[in-house]
Swiss-Prot record:
Family (UniProt): Belongs to the cytochrome P450 family.
Mutant lacking the gene: phenotype: Semi-dwarf phenotype.
Name under which the protein is recorded: Ent-kaurene oxidase 2
Gene3D superfamilies given in the database record: Cytochrome P450
Length: 505
């Protein structure tokens, strides 16, 4: 849910322009609030026809929603063109929706861009809760993300962190005074892990029939991750006015379908290459191999599930770890506290995943980062398919629902000084075990994130090793660079840091 962006043919511009002009005339007479049903959530005043779209034009809806929550409360209604949307901004109400009222609100409501990019919900994360969802979630947990499967990939995760540290050491040795770009190093190794898990091999290049040439690993990453994340936030104004769906929006369609076609061509090439290795007896156990053996999926479903596995670690895990290292570099006292905890528990031994349960402050750093920098600020919209109640309010069938995790985690009634990054709020026994997951970064209930265990392993082990090995300091002037971009809370300004070897051995 982004800004109202008219586009496409002149007819579209004229039609929408007329609506906006009418709305502007109405605005002169006073802002008009949506008609309120008895016992309905509070409604944010908007304009005729377009509702509240003009108030979301900054493309940071999670922040706007949080500001409205301070005025209208944790649950309220807005209008986005023809649609009525209930926005939830508190942990209590969000959990009621995701757990207690799950049966009434389990259907995903995707934008036109996401519908195209996910091939109409052909993924674990975006599918409706149905037999298909249960089946494919079982597949990914059994073969890649569950407890047993994670043990299988332990050596690869350890090697990933080792490779990153080796690169950091080399960069520091080559130029001790130059800041390094954290994301460049972390991104490459995460993508390597994703490819090995998904495809059985760290693919350096692949021949794509549609392109008529080999493409590099960087091009593979751009086609399957970067371009897709940017395209996912493309706005089709017809989503808000379905009765105008007949009007062309050529600029949107060209961008989205070109990106999707390119992704499909690259994924087909990667899958074809792995199938050829299987025939030659050279393939290693991986997610694709598991899915092929199950023999229950169409070619399209197979491609989408492998693509989902490819981007799962390569995006949100990067986002969380980069923000954690940003905050530790910005707050040297908290970085020192974490380092001393690691020293007390590990001594001169290298910190490993086995040490993680004995590092409570590291755990606090992780959860506070998830709270302050929610990897996915807005949970993808859901569709209320039967009349229900939320927080005592009546919510009719046909309503869309958005959970604003950013708003939940910045709610002053639930968190003290929420704008500050304070790991201590999760440390020292101040919260019960269940409260550690109050941030809802991994969702809740039957739609909880399948990749939560792997994300925790990677982020916590990486942060611990990075702090054990180096002292971290921000590049001068970067202390307040907290803007985000893309569908996830991707840091707009990549983290630039100065590293100092600790010389622990």
């Amino acid at each position: 849910m982004e800004a109202f962006v008219p586009g496409g043919a002149g007819a579209a511009a004229a039609a929408v322009g007329g609506f906006v002009a009418a709305a502007a005339l109405a605005e002169r007479a006073g802002v008009i609030a949506p008609r309120k049903r008895p016992n309905a959530p509070p409604a944010v005043p908007g304009l005729p026809i377009i509702g509240n779209l003009h108030q979301l034009k900054e493309k940071k809806p999670h922040q706007t929603f949080a500001k409205w929550a301070e005025i209208y409360g944790p649950i309220y209604t807005i209008r986005t063109g023809a649609s009525s949307v209930v926005v939830l901004n508190s942990t209590e109400v969000a959990k009621e929706a995701m757990v207690a009222k799950f049966s009434s609100i389990s259907t995903r409501k995707l934008s036109k861009a996401l519908t195209v990019l996910t091939r109409d919900k052909s993924m674990v994360a975006t599918s409706d809760y149905c037999d298909f969802h249960k089946m494919v979630k079982r597949y990914v947990m059994s073969s890649m993300l569950g407890t047993s499967a994670q043990k299988q990939f332990r050596d690869i995760r350890d090697m990933m962190i080792h490779n990153m540290l080796s690169t950091f050491h080399k960069l520091v040795k080559d130029d001790p005074h130059a800041p390094l770009i954290f994301r460049d190093v972390f991104k490459d190794e995460l993508f390597r892990l994703s490819m090995i898990q998904s495809l059985g091999e760290d693919v350096s290049s692949v021949y794509v029939d549609e392109f008529g040439r080999d493409i590099s690993k960087e091009e593979i990453y751009n086609a399957t991750v970067t371009d897709m994340m940017m395209c996912a936030i493309e706005v089709d104004w017809r989503d808000f006015f379905p009765y105008l769906s007949w009007v062309p929006n050529k600029s949107f369609e060209t961008r989205v379908f070109t990106t999707e076609t390119r992704r499909t061509a690259v994924m087909r090439a990667l899958i074809k290459q792995q199938k050829e290795r299987i025939v030659r007896g050279e393939a290693k156990t991986c997610y694709l191999d598991f899915l092929l053996a199950e023999n229950t999926l169409t070619d399209e479903q197979l491609m989408m599930l492998v693509w989902e596995a490819l981007i799962e670690a390569a995006d949100t895990t990067l986002v969380t770890t980069e923000w954690a290292m940003y905050e530790l570099a910005k707050n040297p006292d908290k970085q020192e506290r974490l380092y001393q905890e690691i020293r007390e528990v590990c001594g001169d031994e290298t910190v490993t995943e086995e040490h993680l349960p004995r590092l409570p402050y590291l755990n606090a750093v992780f959860h506070e980062t998830l709270r302050r920098h929610s990897p996915v600020p807005l949970i993808p919209p859901r569709f209320v398919h039967e009349d229900t109640k939320l927080a005592g309010y009546d919510v009719p069938a046909g309503t869309e629902m958005v959970i604003n995790l950013y708003g939940c985690n910045m709610n002053r009634k639930e968190w003290e000084s929420p704008e500050e990054w304070v790991p201590e709020r999760f440390a020292g026994g101040r919260l019960e075990v269940a409260d550690m997951y109050k941030t809802m970064a991994f969702g809740a209930g039957r739609r909880a994130c399948a990749g939560s265990l792997q994300a925790t392993h990677i982020a916590c082990a990486a942060v611990a090793r990075f702090v054990q090995e180096f002292g971290w300091r921000l590049r001068e002037g970067d202390e307040e660079k907290v803007d985000t971009v893309q569908l996830t809370a991707y840091k707009l300004h990549p983290l630039h840091v100065h590293l100092t070897r600790r010389g622990r051995m």
